From Swiss-Prot:
Presence of keyword Ion transport: no
Record keywords: Hydrolase, Signal
Species the sequence originates in: Streptococcus mutans serotype c (strain ATCC 700610 / UA159)
Name of the protein: Putative hydrolase SMU_367
Ranges where the Peptidase C51 domain occurs: 85-209
Enzyme class: hydrolase
Signal peptide coordinates: 1-29
E.C. designation(s): 3.-.-.-
Amino acid sequence: MKKQFLEKAVFTVAATAATVVLGNKMADADTYTLQEGDSFFSVAQRYHMDAYELASMNGKDITSLILPGQTLTVNGSAAPDNQAAAPTDTTQATTETNDANANTYPVGQCTWGVKAVATWAGDWWGNGGDWASSASAQGYTVGNTPAVGSIMCWTDGGYGHVAYVTAVGEDGKVQVLESNYKDQQWVDNYRGWFDPNNSGTPGSVSYIYPN
């Protein structure tokens, strides 16, 4: 099945002040083969790493698409299978991203997550359920066909939800980056491939396309 992928989304992250000694890190480097459901955040948590550093070590950024079977270079010790990995400090990273993009939405919310990736999104579009109408009022095209780089909106008459489309399959299934999915308040690909019209997220689905 042919699929359309977004190889790299524009995602600005504030530069860290610390100097990383790559030589020492590569000397201790190991590899990890990605499993179904893995993400930069889950692998980084497993190896007590920072997700943004992990992506950079592998020549990618945090929004790059990774798939089961691919190998990532890692460092650090993996947590035992019967022991939960120590949480990484994602709060600092997401806060820096918010500052870098002048993100006007509450940190951790779905609107914040999409604005962090799709910086062209409006600053004051309201809750996720308001985004389609707000974008249309500002001259953006809103439609019913998924497209890589578009913003997916679930409008349910309440808060709604939004996500950023990174891949579209010929069967209509999509992959997205989103925040606040099942209360997980950082940007990630939580669902893999899914049918946007049968996703378990309530509301009618529409898409905002960048101008």
